[in-house]
Amino acid sequence: MVFQPISEFLLIRNAGMSMYFNKIISFNIISRIVICIFLICGMFMAGASEKYDANAPQQVQPYSVSSSAFENLHPNNEMESSINPFSASDTERNAAIIDRANKEQETEAVNKMISTGARLAASGRASDVAHSMVGDAVNQEIKQWLNRFGTAQVNLNFDKNFSLKESSLDWLAPWYDSASFLFFSQLGIRNKDSRNTLNLGVGIRTLENGWLYGLNTFYDNDLTGHNHRIGLGAEAWTDYLQLAANGYFRLNGWHSSRDFSDYKERPATGGDLRANAYLPALPQLGGKLMYEQYTGERVALFGKDNLQRNPYAVTAGINYTPVPLLTVGVDQRMGKSSKHETQWNLQMNYRLGESFQSQLSPSAVAGTRLLAESRYNLVDRNNNIVLEYQKQQVVKLTLSPATISGLPGQVYQVNAQVQGASAVREIVWSDAELIAAGGTLTPLSTTQFNLVLPPYKRTAQVSRVTDDLTANFYSLSALAVDHQGNRSNSFTLSVTVQQPQLTLTAAVIGDGAPANGKTAITVEFTVADFEGKPLAGQEVVITTNNGALPNKITEKTDANGVARIALTNTTDGVTVVTAEVEGQRQSVDTHFVKGTIAADKSTLAAVPTSIIADGLMASTITLELKDTYGDPQAGANVAFDTTLGNMGVITDHNDGTYSAPLTSTTLGVATVTVKVDGAAFSVPSVTVNFTADPIPDAGRSSFTVSTPDILADGTMSSTLSFVPVDKNGHFISGMQGLSFTQNGVPVSISPITEQPDSYTATVVGNTAGDVTITPQVDTLILSTLQKKISLFPVPTLTGILVNGQNFATDKGFPKTIFKNATFQLQMDNDVANNTQYEWSSSFTPNVSVNDQGQVTITYQTYSEVAVTAKSKKFPSYSVSYRFYPNRWIYDGGTSLVSSLEASRQCQGSDMSAVLESSRATNGTRAPDGTLWGEWGSLTAYSSDWQSGEYWVKKTSTDFETMNMDTGALVQGPAYLAFPLCALAI
């Protein structure tokens, strides 16, 4: 049966790029296999189904999976069905089935209308509509069947060819289910990295004390790559928290890999620990944490393109589920060797059998975090098999001949035969022992080599047959490498050096001589027989190379069997000296050394070491370059590097010295180093200090005062700030000879302090007036920068004006007060200065003061009164005048009465008594605490007071009168006067 697409493509264009989002569900071979498996399992579960559906309605309206259900299905979106038929009672289950059937019946018509509309929106052919109807029917049956058993999770990805690559399907089916125990199976099939994997598992879950504990085992089968493994897992769940641990163990060995040519593969053994948690207060927000590790030499934990040895990874992520239908999240995966990747997740969790409204309800999210709705969740494990890879042996090497035996110096050709799919890039030899013994192995081509046997080695033992054989046997190993980087097996070439009739030994005397053409190196060759006895009179041909002299001589050995050569050279390097006698050859390396530049013999200097950074003044940098013998070295490629400033052109003086000027317009310290032939030269570096011009430029410098006005109190200060800048715009630090000169009233200037960007001092004074201050450096007066500071008198209360009198401020005025009593405070000897202050009273409204310093008393006071004048120009300065009255004065009436009546009226007015004579007047105006002495005639303050006589008392029974106009006391009887009452306060 062939399933046809049920709708056509939807083309979406965005920003000039075309992106196809498939609306078509086309089941391929994998889906057909899965359907068949589900149908077979369905037959076995029919009995169980009848048990749970015994009381259900016999006919349930099918729920159609139409094309509209998949219109929003993009790659990596998941449709999840979680139906738990075994967790509820029969009555509850029947009610749920009926309710679901009603919901499905209500939505079926809409689904069919959308499905039909999608089909008619296609090409319009009748056959396409028919095929789509068949596809709808199949989808309807699959979904209805899945709704009956367990939990299914489908992840369908469709590419432009309608294949199901990177798709997956998992299904958990409960076989035995009770309130506290669940036995289930889980079937899964998936496609990832072009591999189809089948997962078969069984498990149990049990509920104890609010925790769900589970064990499971899985068989994982890579159907495409023929890999098999078994998995063991454990679970521990509770509300809002899920913990899991899994182990994975391979069941098959190495076999050819389908991912890499020339590689084998097998499952990697490993395991993981997983945790998923959700916030009870905010169940929409969840987090995950996973640790996984696998063992092996080349394990593809981060994909087949990132193979690692014993890799591990830690994954941390957060997710947010605003409604049950949608989950978004981000995972950060970090592994070995700084491997990391970020995964953004968008998951559609469509629960088949539930209304669409419930899946868009935020309040439904909390229930999905509880055990009641999660006991049928799929097992949390890695269903994809992690693979380990191993390089295959694809190149085979053989050597011809495989063994060589000959005399010293004999030459043999060695041929390499290589079998492999790719051409040979090189043959790698392990021939260090042969080369060290004096033999050579020279390539003629990639696979052909000339081998020259080394000298024969003689041992010192008397019986040395076996030792000689061992000492002159060499085992050379070779392996071939093709252009793909593949290496062959190692092949061994056995080399035996036969004993010659004569032997040659060499000794070098004076090696490492200078290559000056004068100093010689002596090489002595000793010729001996097979027993090591020196042979005299043997002709030895000695040759040299690399331009040495002589280049060839023939010498006869002396009585000690020694032939000598003394060679010189003007070319440094290795000179090979070779001696030959009767077919025997012996070579030895000699070394001529040309003097090389030496940092410990060379010097670097800077003159001068401190200059002004004006871009004109220069420090001369000089290098004296010498070799190891202390000789000057001219003509070298010398460069100076500086960390600051500009280095001029280097001049070679042809005597081993090199110099260049260094200038700068930037302040700081320049460090100069040397390079020779582009490489760092370790001669000690030198430093040059670029400073500012010590003479400040008036046009660029600045001079400021923090405030131009201060009080002449010796405390308030103004801060002077001088910023000296030279003509190049540089701040001058460490300035010497700086002072601030003054002209005007005398002031005190503190010592000058250097700040990071200025020079500061403070000014205070005690004399009012103006002073001008000018910065001066030595004899240079910067008159254009001078500033003026004005010193003002300290605010002072100088007098109290009371009814024509000016009282001193220290006499405690007033002691007596009355309604509408007024006086004026005088600031700085003139009431005209009162407007320069802000006035306030501490006892308002009884005592008030205006902006002229006029104080008015409207009612009696009960404590000390403070009248404060705050300077408007210097708000931090204020002056307060304080007084504490002790008598409140009041006229007992406006009628003339007798002394007895006056006493009665004062007492009747709640006054203590008639004012005592001693508190009434002394006959003179003075701040003496008497009423008339302080205030004079009270008629000047209010019309409530009358001119004439007022009763006062000398004693409690002896009365006399006081004239309000003159303040005079009149003794003797008086018949009528005004009452003058007083209340102690």
Swiss-Prot record:
It comes from Yersinia pseudotuberculosis serotype I (strain IP32953). Keywords: Disulfide bond, Repeat. Pfam families: Big_1, IAT_beta, Intimin_C, Invasin_D3, Invasin_D4. This is Invasin. Gene3D superfamilies: 2.60.40.1080, Immunoglobulins, Inverse autotransporter, beta-domain, Mannose-Binding Protein A, subunit A. Residues 595-694 are annotated as: D2. GO terms for cellular component: cell outer membrane; cell surface. Invasin is a protein that allows enteric bacteria to penetrate cultured mammalian cells. The entry of invasin in the cell is mediated by binding several beta-1 chain integrins. Residues 494-985 are extracellular. Residues 695-794 are annotated as: D3. Residues 503-594, 601-691 form the Big-1 domain. Residues 795-886 are annotated as: D4. Its main location: other. The lineage of its organism: Bacteria, Pseudomonadati, Pseudomonadota, Gammaproteobacteria, Enterobacterales. GO terms for biological process: cell adhesion. Disulfide bonds join C906-C981.
